[in-house]
Amino acid sequence: MSQRKGDEFLLSPSLIEVSVIGHATENLKKIKKAVLNIVPEEEKATLAFTIEKLEGHHGNPIFMIKTTLKNLSGNFLEFLFKALPPEDKLKLLNELNAHIDNECNFYVRLDKQAAFMGETRIKQEDPIRLRMKFKNLKRSILIKKLQEMLKK
């Protein structure tokens, strides 16, 4: 979804799905705090978490913690990209094509431990997973707009 803010094109996902796996040894409250730390203040009040109990590869108990952000009031992408360190922004910029599917979903994985500490970092292992859905936008336009935002 895109909007205009004055003369500026505002790129905003129509939906953001956040999911993270919690292990039996982890504190669920801390995992929720990590998720809250990557969300703009104005979106936190609307978050509702679902927790699903699952079984890991070795029979160990794990939890899938999920939340969905809809009707975003602010610019989540701007918030996210400003929080990323320069080296992570560059890495994401260089790999952007691999993070966007043909349905204009933009996927990002963030470091769960860093998020708990109030930092935003890209990380593939044991991450907080974000799936940002964009409607009524061509993939090529989405890539171009994300590139522009990441270069700021």
Predicted regions mapped to residue ranges:
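A common structural junction motif
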Residues: 38-43, 84-88, 126-129, 150-152
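Long, charge-patterned amphipathic alpha-helical coiled-coil/hairpin "stalk" segments used as oligomerization
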Residues: 78-123
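Short, charge-patterned binding micro-sites
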Residues: 45-72
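Long, hydrophobic N-terminal alpha-helical segment
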Residues: 1-46
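Short, conserved charged micro-motifs
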Residues: 26-30, 73-79, 117, 140-143
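Beta-strand elements of well-folded, non-transmembrane domains
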Residues: 20-24, 39, 69-73, 112-116, ...
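Glycine-rich, aromatic-bearing surface loops/beta-hairpins
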Residues: 106-152
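Short amphipathic alpha-helices in soluble, non-transmembrane regions
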Residues: 31-34, 78-85, 146-147
